[in-house]
Amino acid sequence: MRADPTSTVLIVGASRGIGFETVKLALKAGHSVRALARSATAIRSRDPKLEKLDGDALDQHTMERALVGVDAVIQTLGVSPTPELIFSGTRLFSIATRILVNAMEVSTVRRLISVTGPIEE
């Protein structure tokens, strides 16, 4: 991936797992990164091209604010598998994606990569 030195990528679900690995790879590729997580202080990086943003991916207003000034979105939401969640499933991925796409429709952002977890909905 060749980075445009002025490109900014929003990574949703950036505090750990695939999300945090994606943050590291995007920074290494030269992108500026806006990392959204419920607890952005958990993101362990001090890279000057990293902007940490606390927020809830299920909140429309949060997603609209997070999209301002970004060129692309990588959605990497995950859940901690609990016995209840494994047997009942989750709608986190479908709901968050719907909210994100709605927010993108009123923004200028048109690029989206979404990585979801193994829990069936």
Annotate each language-model stretch with its function.
Residues T41-I95, I99, A103:
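NAD(P)H-binding glycine-rich loop region in Rossmannoid oxidoreductase-like domains
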Residues R2, S7-A29:
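N-terminal Rossmann NAD(P)H-binding glycine-rich loop of SDR-like oxidoreductase domains
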Residues S15, S32-R34, A40, I95-E121:
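Conserved Rossmann-fold NAD(P)-dependent oxidoreductase catalytic core, especially the SDR/UDP-sugar
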Residues G13-G19, G30, G55, G69, ...:
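Glycine-centered flexibility sites
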Residues T8, D71-A72, R111:
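Structural motif
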Residues D4-P5, A29, P48, V68-G69, ...:
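Residue-level preference for short coil/turn positions at secondary-structure junctions
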Residues I11, A35, K52:
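Conserved SAM-binding loop
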Residues T6-T8, L27-R34, R38-R46:
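N-terminal beta1-alpha1-beta2 submodule of the flavodoxin-like/Rossmannoid cofactor-binding fold
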